[in-house]
Regions:
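Long, largely alpha-helical accessory region at the distal end of helicase-like NTP-driven motors
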Residues: 1, 213-233
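Helicase motor interdomain insertion/brace
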Residues: 1-96, 100
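Well-ordered alpha-helical segments embedded in enzymatic catalytic cores
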Residues: 65-73, 121-125, 142
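Conserved helicase ATPase core of P-loop NTP-dependent helicases/translocases
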Residues: 80-84, 90-141
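Alpha-helical elements of the RecA-like P-loop NTPase motor core of helicases
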Residues: 92, 96, 145, 165, ...
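Conserved RecA-like helicase motor core of SF1/SF2 enzymes
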Residues: 110-112, 116-117, 134-135, 141-177, ...
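Conserved segment of the helicase C-terminal RecA-like domain
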Residues: 130, 171-203
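Acidic, Ser/Thr-rich peripheral helices and adjacent loops at domain boundaries
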Residues: 202-211
Length: 233
Protein backbone atom coordinates (compact mmCIF):
# COMPACT_ATOMS: atom_id res chain seq x y z
CA UNK A 1 0.00 0.00 0.00
CA UNK A 2 2.76 2.43 1.00
CA UNK A 3 4.77 1.56 -2.12
CA UNK A 4 1.67 2.13 -4.23
CA UNK A 5 1.24 5.63 -2.80
CA UNK A 6 4.90 6.44 -3.50
CA UNK A 7 4.62 5.19 -7.08
CA UNK A 8 1.47 7.23 -7.68
CA UNK A 9 3.07 10.39 -6.27
CA UNK A 10 6.29 9.82 -8.23
CA UNK A 11 4.29 9.31 -11.44
CA UNK A 12 2.44 12.59 -10.90
CA UNK A 13 5.75 14.42 -10.46
CA UNK A 14 7.19 12.82 -13.59
CA UNK A 15 4.15 13.60 -15.74
CA UNK A 16 3.47 17.15 -14.54
CA UNK A 17 6.94 18.43 -13.59
CA UNK A 18 9.73 16.57 -15.32
CA UNK A 19 12.61 14.11 -15.18
CA UNK A 20 14.81 15.92 -12.64
CA UNK A 21 12.08 16.51 -10.02
CA UNK A 22 11.12 12.84 -10.39
CA UNK A 23 14.70 11.67 -9.82
CA UNK A 24 15.15 14.01 -6.86
CA UNK A 25 12.00 12.62 -5.25
CA UNK A 26 13.23 9.06 -5.82
CA UNK A 27 16.62 9.91 -4.30
CA UNK A 28 15.01 11.18 -1.09
CA UNK A 29 12.52 8.31 -0.95
CA UNK A 30 15.26 5.73 -1.40
CA UNK A 31 17.26 7.22 1.48
CA UNK A 32 14.35 6.73 3.86
CA UNK A 33 13.82 3.62 5.94
CA UNK A 34 10.36 2.20 5.94
CA UNK A 35 7.99 -0.47 4.76
CA UNK A 36 8.09 -0.94 1.01
CA UNK A 37 11.21 1.12 0.25
CA UNK A 38 13.39 -1.89 -0.61
CA UNK A 39 10.57 -3.54 -2.55
CA UNK A 40 10.06 -0.40 -4.59
CA UNK A 41 13.67 0.38 -5.49
CA UNK A 42 15.18 -3.10 -5.64
CA UNK A 43 12.46 -5.63 -6.37
CA UNK A 44 9.79 -3.84 -8.42
CA UNK A 45 11.09 -4.41 -11.96
CA UNK A 46 8.76 -1.89 -13.59
CA UNK A 47 9.76 0.93 -11.25
CA UNK A 48 13.47 0.19 -11.44
CA UNK A 49 13.22 0.20 -15.24
CA UNK A 50 11.37 3.54 -15.16
CA UNK A 51 14.07 4.94 -12.89
CA UNK A 52 16.80 3.72 -15.22
CA UNK A 53 15.09 5.21 -18.29
CA UNK A 54 14.64 8.53 -16.47
CA UNK A 55 18.37 8.68 -15.73
CA UNK A 56 19.18 8.02 -19.38
CA UNK A 57 16.74 10.74 -20.44
CA UNK A 58 18.31 13.22 -18.02
CA UNK A 59 21.81 12.43 -19.31
CA UNK A 60 20.53 13.19 -22.82
CA UNK A 61 19.18 16.58 -21.75
CA UNK A 62 15.52 15.52 -21.82
CA UNK A 63 13.38 17.16 -19.13
CA UNK A 64 9.71 17.88 -19.96
CA UNK A 65 7.80 19.14 -22.99
CA UNK A 66 6.76 22.15 -20.90
CA UNK A 67 10.30 23.53 -20.93
CA UNK A 68 10.57 24.43 -24.65
CA UNK A 69 7.01 25.76 -24.43
CA UNK A 70 8.05 27.89 -21.49
CA UNK A 71 10.89 29.39 -23.52
CA UNK A 72 8.49 30.14 -26.38
CA UNK A 73 6.03 31.87 -24.04
CA UNK A 74 8.68 33.97 -22.32
CA UNK A 75 10.11 35.11 -25.64
CA UNK A 76 6.67 36.03 -26.99
CA UNK A 77 5.83 38.57 -24.27
CA UNK A 78 8.48 41.14 -23.28
CA UNK A 79 8.78 42.28 -19.68
CA UNK A 80 8.60 40.57 -16.32
CA UNK A 81 7.15 37.12 -15.79
CA UNK A 82 6.21 35.14 -12.70
CA UNK A 83 6.26 31.34 -12.93
CA UNK A 84 4.41 29.32 -10.30
CA UNK A 85 5.05 25.69 -9.41
CA UNK A 86 4.05 23.77 -6.30
CA UNK A 87 7.19 21.65 -6.11
CA UNK A 88 10.58 22.94 -4.94
CA UNK A 89 12.58 20.61 -7.14
CA UNK A 90 10.67 22.05 -10.10
CA UNK A 91 11.74 25.56 -9.09
CA UNK A 92 15.39 24.54 -9.16
CA UNK A 93 15.00 22.66 -12.44
CA UNK A 94 13.15 25.52 -14.17
CA UNK A 95 15.70 28.05 -12.88
CA UNK A 96 18.54 25.93 -14.24
CA UNK A 97 16.83 25.49 -17.61
CA UNK A 98 16.15 29.22 -17.93
CA UNK A 99 19.77 30.05 -17.16
CA UNK A 100 20.88 27.64 -19.89
CA UNK A 101 18.54 29.48 -22.29
CA UNK A 102 20.17 32.78 -21.35
CA UNK A 103 17.06 34.03 -19.52
CA UNK A 104 17.78 35.87 -16.26
CA UNK A 105 15.74 34.39 -13.42
CA UNK A 106 15.45 34.36 -9.65
CA UNK A 107 14.08 31.84 -7.16
CA UNK A 108 11.47 32.43 -4.46
CA UNK A 109 10.71 29.55 -2.11
CA UNK A 110 9.45 29.35 1.45
CA UNK A 111 11.32 28.21 4.54
CA UNK A 112 10.75 24.62 5.63
CA UNK A 113 13.04 23.13 8.26
CA UNK A 114 16.67 23.55 7.28
CA UNK A 115 15.90 24.26 3.64
CA UNK A 116 14.42 27.18 1.72
CA UNK A 117 14.72 30.93 2.10
CA UNK A 118 14.24 32.85 5.32
CA UNK A 119 11.84 35.79 5.19
CA UNK A 120 14.67 38.34 4.98
CA UNK A 121 16.12 36.55 1.97
CA UNK A 122 12.68 36.29 0.37
CA UNK A 123 12.25 40.06 0.66
CA UNK A 124 15.70 40.60 -0.89
CA UNK A 125 14.80 38.38 -3.86
CA UNK A 126 11.51 40.22 -4.40
CA UNK A 127 13.29 43.59 -4.26
CA UNK A 128 15.84 42.45 -6.86
CA UNK A 129 12.94 41.40 -9.08
CA UNK A 130 11.28 44.78 -8.60
CA UNK A 131 14.57 46.52 -9.42
CA UNK A 132 14.90 44.56 -12.65
CA UNK A 133 17.99 42.53 -11.74
CA UNK A 134 16.22 39.59 -13.37
CA UNK A 135 13.13 39.45 -15.57
CA UNK A 136 11.68 36.11 -14.45
CA UNK A 137 10.83 34.93 -10.94
CA UNK A 138 10.18 31.23 -10.33
CA UNK A 139 8.14 30.78 -7.15
CA UNK A 140 6.37 28.23 -5.00
CA UNK A 141 3.28 28.97 -2.91
CA UNK A 142 5.10 31.71 -0.96
CA UNK A 143 4.82 33.90 -4.05
CA UNK A 144 1.05 33.55 -4.18
CA UNK A 145 0.34 35.67 -1.14
CA UNK A 146 1.90 37.90 1.49
CA UNK A 147 4.94 39.33 -0.25
CA UNK A 148 4.59 42.53 -2.25
CA UNK A 149 5.72 41.33 -5.65
CA UNK A 150 5.98 43.91 -8.40
CA UNK A 151 3.51 44.14 -11.26
CA UNK A 152 4.36 41.56 -13.92
CA UNK A 153 3.47 41.33 -17.60
CA UNK A 154 2.53 37.68 -17.42
CA UNK A 155 1.92 34.88 -14.96
CA UNK A 156 2.63 31.28 -15.94
CA UNK A 157 1.29 28.23 -14.10
CA UNK A 158 3.92 25.52 -14.61
CA UNK A 159 1.61 23.19 -12.73
CA UNK A 160 -2.01 23.35 -11.57
CA UNK A 161 -3.66 23.42 -8.15
CA UNK A 162 -7.12 22.07 -7.21
CA UNK A 163 -7.91 25.22 -5.24
CA UNK A 164 -9.97 28.17 -6.44
CA UNK A 165 -8.31 30.45 -3.86
CA UNK A 166 -4.77 29.59 -4.96
CA UNK A 167 -5.77 29.84 -8.63
CA UNK A 168 -7.15 33.34 -8.08
CA UNK A 169 -4.14 34.36 -5.96
CA UNK A 170 -1.73 33.22 -8.65
CA UNK A 171 -3.72 34.89 -11.42
CA UNK A 172 -4.01 38.10 -9.40
CA UNK A 173 -0.26 38.71 -9.62
CA UNK A 174 -0.69 40.16 -13.12
CA UNK A 175 -2.99 42.75 -14.68
CA UNK A 176 -3.16 44.97 -11.59
CA UNK A 177 -2.25 48.24 -13.29
CA UNK A 178 -2.32 47.24 -16.95
CA UNK A 179 -3.42 44.32 -19.10
CA UNK A 180 -1.55 41.17 -18.12
CA UNK A 181 -1.31 37.71 -19.63
CA UNK A 182 -2.05 34.40 -17.90
CA UNK A 183 -0.72 31.14 -19.31
CA UNK A 184 -1.58 27.74 -17.84
CA UNK A 185 0.61 24.80 -18.87
CA UNK A 186 -1.24 21.48 -18.83
CA UNK A 187 0.21 18.03 -19.52
CA UNK A 188 -2.74 16.27 -21.14
CA UNK A 189 -4.23 13.21 -19.43
CA UNK A 190 -2.26 13.80 -16.21
CA UNK A 191 -2.94 15.15 -12.72
CA UNK A 192 -2.32 18.58 -14.28
CA UNK A 193 -5.52 18.39 -16.30
CA UNK A 194 -7.52 17.00 -13.37
CA UNK A 195 -6.40 19.77 -11.01
CA UNK A 196 -7.07 22.47 -13.61
CA UNK A 197 -10.72 21.48 -14.06
CA UNK A 198 -11.26 20.99 -10.32
CA UNK A 199 -9.97 24.52 -9.73
CA UNK A 200 -12.15 25.95 -12.50
CA UNK A 201 -15.28 24.23 -11.15
CA UNK A 202 -14.59 25.60 -7.68
CA UNK A 203 -14.22 29.12 -9.09
CA UNK A 204 -17.55 28.77 -10.90
CA UNK A 205 -19.21 27.50 -7.72
CA UNK A 206 -17.75 30.39 -5.70
CA UNK A 207 -19.04 32.93 -8.24
CA UNK A 208 -22.49 31.35 -8.11
CA UNK A 209 -22.55 31.51 -4.31
CA UNK A 210 -21.38 35.14 -4.41
CA UNK A 211 -24.16 36.02 -6.82
CA UNK A 212 -26.76 34.38 -4.57
CA UNK A 213 -25.44 36.21 -1.52
CA UNK A 214 -25.58 39.54 -3.36
CA UNK A 215 -29.21 38.97 -4.31
CA UNK A 216 -30.13 38.00 -0.74
CA UNK A 217 -28.37 41.06 0.69
CA UNK A 218 -30.22 43.29 -1.76
CA UNK A 219 -33.52 41.77 -0.68
CA UNK A 220 -32.63 42.31 2.95
CA UNK A 221 -32.41 46.04 2.31
CA UNK A 222 -36.19 45.90 2.16
CA UNK A 223 -37.33 45.64 5.83
CA UNK A 224 -40.53 43.89 4.71
CA UNK A 225 -38.54 40.92 3.34
CA UNK A 226 -37.12 38.40 5.79
CA UNK A 227 -34.58 35.90 4.47
CA UNK A 228 -33.13 32.88 6.25
CA UNK A 229 -30.13 30.66 5.54
CA UNK A 230 -32.21 28.54 3.15
CA UNK A 231 -31.83 31.27 0.54
CA UNK A 232 -28.12 30.47 0.21
CA UNK A 233 -28.70 26.77 -0.45
Amino acid sequence: MFSGIRIHYALNILEAHGITPFLEFCKRAQAKKGVGVKDLFEIDANFTQALSLAKVAQSNGIEHSKIPKLKEILNSVPGKALIFTSYRDSVNMIHSQLNEMGISAGILIGKAGDTGLKQKKQIEVVQKFRDGEFQVLVATRVGEEGLDIAEVNQVIFYDNVPSSIRFIQRRGRTGRKDTGKLVVLIAKNTIDETYYWIGKRKITAAKSMGSKMTKVLEKNKDPSVKTGLDAFI
